[in-house]
Amino acid sequence: ERETAQSFDTMCEDIYSGRLDYGIIPISNGRDGRLPVFYELINRYELKIVLACSVGADEGEKTLFALAGKSIPYPEMPFGEPTSLELFVTPGGGQSLTEMFRAAETCGMELQRIDSFGFSSVGEGVTFSPVFSAEGAEIGTFLLYMTAVFPQYTPIGIYRMIR
């Protein structure tokens, strides 16, 4: 397992440095849910999710794999119309996650899930990672809102989900 983690770390570093355009990493599975060690790599190497695919296993469990790159090709979206938007958000200064959820709903998005992480590189407090369904939504408008109201946010994925 340690060798596998080092291999993923090397791959992510290669994407960050430009030696690779993309890499595939697991981001969640049916047994453990979100996989924090891989989100730590996404955070550390400032990677972006550009495509996701759910793959079934023999036992019926599914693993979600992400195609990760250095940037989000928005609004061009060469991998198809986006169906999901994923962020890292560290609220502060009286900001409310409820306000963010209302803005997302106004822009045509729906919260699918939210997790929290304690990334040391982001600073004080907890970083939340909401995933919104974004098919047909006003993603650009929502990101403009986030820039104005939540300066401590990072889009980590605008992607199409392949099932």
What name fits each language-model region?
Residues 1-163:
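Domain-level signature for soluble enzymes in the chorismate/prephenate branch of the shikimate pathway
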